């Protein structure tokens, strides 16, 4: 447990996470100062009066006078104000670092470009099925500091690359990088390896590293070692097995579950299940209750979620596909009897869209591209692409064309912030329009 008495603490970024940091320090007798580049950040009205605040910009004077800066994952460490503070020897951490210094129970830590919320939630469900008092949060749901509790027997944290950059005290009982594909390239000017390096921090001091046998970028820099357990489609300690038209989850050659008993579908979800099982095993959860959780878990909203099945047409909301890798996961092995009407678009965060091209061949694909990067996406296969300003226009365009056996899939490969508040709002809008138009 760290001692912050007498420290001059500055918190950058409000919102739920910033408020959890404020509460953390106030409970320890330290009154921090808070700043946010937004004029009226969320949570400003909930800030106790005693806490000094500065909004609309960063206050360099406060930063340079600090003993400790707690930075929101939303601000890049490369920001000139933070660079100057780091050069002056001022410690910069994030809320996850504060959490790791205090947590008394084992931590399962999960990162990756895609699938991390599903796997985090699944491991949490596995713990609950075993009767374990578990705290689930981090980059999903509740901020980590709100989970700190003497009664907690296990923590399961989803961590973003941004959170890992400011974390050095994590000692996970089990840690995984599910996959590494281009995302947030606007924050990583040196490209994919810089982004990967941030993710790799999760393995430091981990007891077990769960790696993806199909993705070399998830391996520790020095290669797999005795701490590593692997999962994969056809290879790995935890893998899929296809026999007589059925698919099984297997562990070291032993069949443990037929996927038809799972509520989740799609190959990417079966590998998510394998990763969750590997983490749960490493954390010492009983296998039987973990498998039971796999048969009852229905998945998360906005993640390949069937929002309407009507007149033989399936409308699927995969709004959480905010990067290319996530849309690839949705399209890989996807079977559609009729035509796939694919909605793509939004803010591509400087990503390369070309890996999607191989999934867009064939006569039964139609593209509807919208938002900031709609033009670029339509260029993937112009002869079957239509371009509109908004998602709603695209949906009104495609609705009269759908036939029984078709699928309408929103898997945009882009962030939503050019036209929506977040991916949830985009997904809810899709669901609303699907019910109106379908």
From Swiss-Prot:
Membrane-traversing stretches: none
Catalysed reactions, as listed in the record: UDP-N-acetyl-alpha-D-muramoyl-L-alanine + D-glutamate + ATP = UDP-N-acetyl-alpha-D-muramoyl-L-alanyl-D-glutamate + ADP + phosphate + H(+)
Upper classification of the organism: Bacteria, Pseudomonadati, Pseudomonadota, Gammaproteobacteria, Enterobacterales
Record-level GO BP terms: cell division; cell wall organization; peptidoglycan biosynthetic process; regulation of cell shape
A GO molecular function held by the record: ATP binding
EC number per UniProt: 6.3.2.9
HAMAP family linked: MurD
Keywords tagged on the record: ATP-binding, Cell cycle, Cell division, Cell shape, Cell wall biogenesis/degradation, Cytoplasm, Ligase, Nucleotide-binding, Peptidoglycan synthesis
Listed InterPro entries: Mur-like_cat_sf, Mur_ligase_C, Mur_ligase_C_dom_sf, Mur_ligase_cen, MurD
Pfam family, one: Mur_ligase_C
Protein name: UDP-N-acetylmuramoylalanine--D-glutamate ligase
Pathway per the UniProt entry: Cell wall biogenesis; peptidoglycan biosynthesis
Subcellular localization: Cytoplasm
Keyword Coiled coil attached: no
Binding annotation for ATP: 112-118
């Amino acid at each position: 447990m760290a001692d912050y008495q007498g420290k001059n603490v500055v918190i950058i970024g409000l919102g739920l996470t910033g408020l959890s940091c404020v509460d953390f320090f106030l409970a320890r007798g330290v009154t921090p100062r808070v700043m946010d580049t937004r004029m009226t950040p969320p949570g400003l009205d909930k800030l106790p009066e005693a806490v000094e605040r500065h909004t609309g910009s960063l206050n360099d004077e406060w930063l340079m006078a600090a003993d400790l800066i707690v930075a929101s994952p939303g601000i890049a460490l490369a920001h000139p104000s933070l660079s100057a503070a780091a050069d002056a020897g001022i410690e910069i951490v994030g809320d996850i670092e504060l959490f790791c210094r205090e947590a008394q129970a084992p931590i399962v830590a999960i990162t990756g470009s895609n699938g991390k919320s599903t796997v985090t939630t699944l491991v949490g469900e596995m713990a609950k099925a075993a009767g374990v008092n578990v705290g689930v949060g981090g980059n999903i749901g509740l901020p980590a500091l709100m989970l700190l509790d003497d009664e907690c027997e296990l923590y399961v944290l989803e961590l973003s690359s941004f959170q890992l950059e400011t974390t050095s005290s994590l000692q996970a009982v089990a840690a995984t990088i599910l996959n590494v594909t281009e995302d947030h390239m606007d924050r990583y000017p040196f490209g994919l390896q810089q982004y990967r390096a941030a993710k790799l921090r999760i393995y430091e001091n981990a007891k077990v590293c769960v790696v993806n046998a199909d993705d070399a970028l998830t391996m520790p820099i020095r290669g797999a070692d005795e701490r590593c357990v692997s999962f994969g489609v056809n290879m790995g300690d935890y893998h899929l097995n296809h026999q007589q038209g059925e698919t099984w989850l297997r562990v070291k050659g032993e069949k443990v579950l037929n996927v038809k008993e799972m509520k989740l579908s799609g190959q990417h979800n079966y590998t998510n299940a394998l990763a969750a099982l590997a983490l749960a095993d490493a954390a010492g959860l009983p296998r039987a209750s973990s498998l039971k959780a796999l048969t009852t878990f229905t998945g998360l909203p906005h993640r390949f979620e069937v929002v309407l099945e009507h007149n033989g047409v399936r409308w699927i909301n995969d709004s959480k596909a905010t990067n290319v890798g996530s849309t690839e996961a949705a399209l890989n092995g996807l079977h559609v009897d009729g035509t796939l009407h694919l909605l793509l678009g939004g803010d591509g965060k400087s990503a390369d869209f070309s890996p999607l091209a191989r999934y867009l061949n064939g006569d039964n694909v139609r593209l509807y591209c919208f938002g900031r990067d709609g033009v670029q996406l339509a260029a993937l296969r112009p002869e079957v692409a239509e371009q509109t300003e908004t998602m709603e226009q695209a949906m009104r365009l495609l609705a009269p064309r759908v036939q029984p056996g078709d699928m309408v899939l929103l898997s945009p490969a882009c962030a939503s912030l050019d036209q929506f508040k977040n991916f949830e709002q985009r997904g809810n809008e899709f669901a609303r329009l699907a019910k109106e138009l379908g």
